[in-house]
């Protein structure tokens, strides 16, 4: 049962003509390829949040017109009545659980890509986008402005038609209304430029027209970056135009959705802050000024990767917010509110702040939303997965051995346990659960010095929540046994007595420097030597680096740069080389890149991009420019760290697979391999693979993934029977539970 301390979180809150059932608010967030083109995906993704207790559930950004097309990134759309019909399925599903549905109306101005529509962009100025190369817009004159505001009204009416309860005018993150408000963009000399009142005019008039059109039936919200964090003449700050704008249009809105930052450069990361640089509730000093200092009496929602129920209570009681806003925490655990309500705090699957969900949006196109913690996100409709409901396996009378307790093995064991397999034994050769997470979570710690910024280097400790959640789940499952310090050979597996065997033994770094740039060993590389090392050896202290260190980073993500950050903070002279044009480019997609590069520069790390390691000699590394291979440079070093290719630890699996007769004699009817033991990948991939295999352990061949529903247009045929059957099965499982 709910602890009375948290009662305040479950109070209803009025938003204009609507009443939210509680204070949990899923703010607008992207979902990969959901949009309005895949109503099944969209409705079940958002509906799962409502079922999990989120009192308000919103779309992603929702385009109002073809002049605001973000392809290949996927937004929802309300261009016409067909879009409204598709999004009505989402509204109906949210309403099934008594929650409110919100639509975030969006026009990107000159930030729009228009790659699909090919329409000419339109904005407050004729000038280039600071975000996308080659994006220019035509100047919006007075007639254009009236036309654009009409598009907002048309979309708002369609939103009401679809069944939305809350209708946004989205402006935060440098969208069109902010392009008018911010002096960084707005250099106009007419009634829409110059003074604050003129710069605010477009946004104010748009709110007036939307409110007049649908305000009697729908709550009117607007999303504002109270501080663009650009300062001076390049943006605005909370102490000037941020507060002033709230007071200027407060009478027109029913709810304020407050955030910070922009999309210029890496500044979106100041809002969707990665955990290694920004802590929980990191926006408080900015967004907290609005309600706490009485600049509005309207309900306020805000975010900050808030996962701790006690922090939530403090936020409400201090009047920082009226709603606990969440994007990433609601992705990691759609049932977070219900778990608080039912007193199951230890079962909350906390967001780790890795921002793989954000990266899945940046990949664009058909990419589904992905989460390291929650393998079921985005799979609610197409695979029929529910994050809290697991059907008993048809072969549940069988015993299962899971070898390896890294992310894939832990997840597989948890899901198998919840599917009521008779006996699941999880065996791990080390003394702790977690696999590679045991050294990854120690990465990146800096010197503790003040960076001079609002962010600090905090390391990857919060990624340990992947292990923490699964360790708690394993302890609750009586049909799952965990055995640590329990290495196994192929012979041990054959003698163990299990009927199904899952190998999840992870991966290791290549010792010869094999890498993605050359797909071959590097002359002179041998990390078994004392003066050469792999990343885990540095982090765990197995090897002690010398003063001069060169890191060769071929992974393009967090490992190489984190080693550089850690060693530089300890006083080492660090050079990091990468064959890629941008150092750790995937970190741009996770919004960590800007923070990381700032910190590496602060620490004095030398960065060499588009550089390959040609040869390693005692005391020296020879590098070359990838475009001019003959242009080599010799670096004097004491230690070389190779963040190169990884190799699966699949020896036990391959030996067992080569002995089919012995498997049959041992009574092993199924042998499977998952995670990095199958193919090295990211943590999210290992968790997903372990989950999928366990979900499908009773299929004909669990190694061959079952087909999933593909929402698509079929020429000359409209047949929803398969989709409807899938939903019937999902709903039946919910009712049975």
Regions of interest found by a model, annotated:
Residues 307-309, 331, 487-490, 538-540, ...:
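Short acidic loop-to-helix transition motifs that present clustered carboxylates
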Residues 437-498, 587-614, 619-620, 634:
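N-terminal Rossmann-like dinucleotide/flavin-binding domain of flavoprotein oxidoreductases
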């Amino acid at each position: 049962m709910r602890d009375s301390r948290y009662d305040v979180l479950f109070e209803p809150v009025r938003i204009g003509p609507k009443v939210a059932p509680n204070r949990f608010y899923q703010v607008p967030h992207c979902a990969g390829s959901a949009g309005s083109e895949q109503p099944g995906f969209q409705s079940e993704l958002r509906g799962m949040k409502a079922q999990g207790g989120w009192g308000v559930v919103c779309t992603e950004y929702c385009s109002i017109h073809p002049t605001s097309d973000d392809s290949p990134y996927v937004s929802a759309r309300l261009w016409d009545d067909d879009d409204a019909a598709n999004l009505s399925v989402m509204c109906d599903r949210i309403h099934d659980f008594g929650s409110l549905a919100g639509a975030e109306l969006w026009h990107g101005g000159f930030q729009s890509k228009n790659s699909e529509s090919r329409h000419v962009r339109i904005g407050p100025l004729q000038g280039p986008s600071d975000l996308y190369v080659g994006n220019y817009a035509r100047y919006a004159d007075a007639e254009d402005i009236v036309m654009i505001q009409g598009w907002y009204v048309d979309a708002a009416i369609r939103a009401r038609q679809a069944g939305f309860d809350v209708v946004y005018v989205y402006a935060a993150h440098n969208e069109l209304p902010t392009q008018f408000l911010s002096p960084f963009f707005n250099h106009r000399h007419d009634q829409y430029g110059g003074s604050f009142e003129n710069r605010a005019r477009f946004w104010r008039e748009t709110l007036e027209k939307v409110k007049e059109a649908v305000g009697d039936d729908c709550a009117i919200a607007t999303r504002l970056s109270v501080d663009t964090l650009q300062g001076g003449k390049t943006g605005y700050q909370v102490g000037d135009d941020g507060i002033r704008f709230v007071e200027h249009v407060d009478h027109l809105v029913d709810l304020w959705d407050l955030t910070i930052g922009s999309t210029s450069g890496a500044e979106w990361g100041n809002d969707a802050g990665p955990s290694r640089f920004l802590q929980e509730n990191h926006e408080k000093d900015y967004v907290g000024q609005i309600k706490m200092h009485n600049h509005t009496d309207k309900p306020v929602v805000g975010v900050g990767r808030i996962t701790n129920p006690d922090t939530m209570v403090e936020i409400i009681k201090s009047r920082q917010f009226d709603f606990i806003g969440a994007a990433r925490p609601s992705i990691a655990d759609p049932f977070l509110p219900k778990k608080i309500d039912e007193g199951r705090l230890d079962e909350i699957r906390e967001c780790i702040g890795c921002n793989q969900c954000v990266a899945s949006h940046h990949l664009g196109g058909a990419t589904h939303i992905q989460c390291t913690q929650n393998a079921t996100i985005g799979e609610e409709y197409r695979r029929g997965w529910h994050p809290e409901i697991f059907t008993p396996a048809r072969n549940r009378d069988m015993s299962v051995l899971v070898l390896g307790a890294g992310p894939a093995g832990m997840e597989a064991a948890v899901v198998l346990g919840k599917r009521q397999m008779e006996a699941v034994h999880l065996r791990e050769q080390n003394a702790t659960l977690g696999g590679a997470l045991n050294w990854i979570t120690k990465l990146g710690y800096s010197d503790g010095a003040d960076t001079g910024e609002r962010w600090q280097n905090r390391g990857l400790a919060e990624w340990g929540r992947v292990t923490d959640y699964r360790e708690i789940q394993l302890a609750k499952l009586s049909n799952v046994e965990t055995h640590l310090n329990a290495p196994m050979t192929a012979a041990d597996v054959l003698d163990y007595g299990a009927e199904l065997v899952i190998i999840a033994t992870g991966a290791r770094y290549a010792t010869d420097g094999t890498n993605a740039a050359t797909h071959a060993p590097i002359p002179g590389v041998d990390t078994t030597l004392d003066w050469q090392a792999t990343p885990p050896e540095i982090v765990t202290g197995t090897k002690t680096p010398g003063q001069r260190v060169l890191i060769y980073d071929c992974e393009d993500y967090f490992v190489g740069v984190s080693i550089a950050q850690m060693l530089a903070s300890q006083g080492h002279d660090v050079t990091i080389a990468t064959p890629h044009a941008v150092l750790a480019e995937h970190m741009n997609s996770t919004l960590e890149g800007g923070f990381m590069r700032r910190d590496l520069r602060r620490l004095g790390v030398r960065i060499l991009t588009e550089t390959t390691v040609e040869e390693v000699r005692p005391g020296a590394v020879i590098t070359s420019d990838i475009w001019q291979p003959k242009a080599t440079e010799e670096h004097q070093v004491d230690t070389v760290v190779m963040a190169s290719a990884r190799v699966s630890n699949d020896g036990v699996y391959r030996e067992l697979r080569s002995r089919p007769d012995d498997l049959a004699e041992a009574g092993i009817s199924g042998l499977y391999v998952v995670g990095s033991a199958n193919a090295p990948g990211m943590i999210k991939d290992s968790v997903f693979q372990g989950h999928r295999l366990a979900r499908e352990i009773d299929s004909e061949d669990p190694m061959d993934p079952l087909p999933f529903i593909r929402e698509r247009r079929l020429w000359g045929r409209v047949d929803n029977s398969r989709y409807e059957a899938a939903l019937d099965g999902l709903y039946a499982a919910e009712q049975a539970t």
